[in-house]
Amino acid sequence: MEHLVDINDVESEEIEQLLDLAASMKENPGEFSGVMDNKSLVMLFAKPSTRTRLSFETGMTQLGGHGIFFEMGSSQLSRGEPISDVSQVMSRYEDAIMARLFEHDEMMELAENADVPVVNGLTDFLHPCQALTDMFTMQEKDRLDTLAFVGDGNNVAHSLMQASAKMGVDCRIATPEGMEPDEEIQDRVSDANVTVTNDPYEAVDGATAVYGDVFVSMGEEEQREEKLAEFDGFQIDQDLMDAARDDAIFMHCLPAHRGEEVTAEVADGPQSVIFDQAENRMHVQKAIVHTLVNQ
């Protein structure tokens, strides 16, 4: 595994090893406190973030390394410097690059020109760190069986489909008509137990984990009212949760908009694991960066 840009490029065995390492790092943090000593991770941001920056930066500190925040808007990138040049320069200074970008093509260009590992912190097409964290959280809660995602067939759904296919998870994606996942992703997982439906109750039936995401993604604010209308009937409320397995967990990549994609009763209820899930981002990402840098 040279980079983590796309889960499709990672073998199932490598994912299992990453999740095992993340579990060890979470359970015994002291054993890993110096494994990234004198190592640096540059964190390239084109999109605002809370969890991505905090989890990567704190994770590097816990491993004895250093995270460097780099905002594209205040750099020469905003004045037209090619991302391929920036990638090569960063490779001379840093031990790894994490990027949170809009365009997936830019992420691929970054990785293609880097001489150090590149980690995809998010693009509009994929969110691999989140999906691997979700597999870890389901495994930690003994719910790594059937995942129902209710929302937009976007980057999170794409990576969940791919991660589920790699891990043998029964994955159901419920979206309004016209918002289904990209056909390229559906083709990639066509041999796996991944289904797409326009009926949230069909998706949730018997699921061990029910997953929500925002109805209005970053950059879609002007379409807010239109998007909310299209998602009518897709809110995750207690009635929908009751259609899942009795011990199902509720997951969300955050930020959550209570009263839109999920009710407060569910988001803050006993089935919710959203803050365990948020914490686990840090541990899984520590495992990813450590593995890539020290392999």
Swiss-Prot record:
UniProt record, GO biological process: arginine biosynthetic process via ornithine; arginine catabolic process to ornithine; citrulline biosynthetic process
Pathway(s) per entry: Amino-acid degradation; L-arginine degradation via ADI pathway; carbamoyl phosphate from L-arginine: step 2/2
Keyword terms of this UniProt record: Arginine metabolism, Cytoplasm, Plasmid, Transferase
Disulfide topology: none
One Pfam assignment: OTCace_N
Gene Ontology cellular component terms for the protein in this record: cytoplasm
Protein name: Ornithine carbamoyltransferase, catabolic
Source organism (scientific name): Halobacterium salinarum (strain ATCC 700922 / JCM 11081 / NRC-1) (Halobacterium halobium)
Annotated gene: arcB
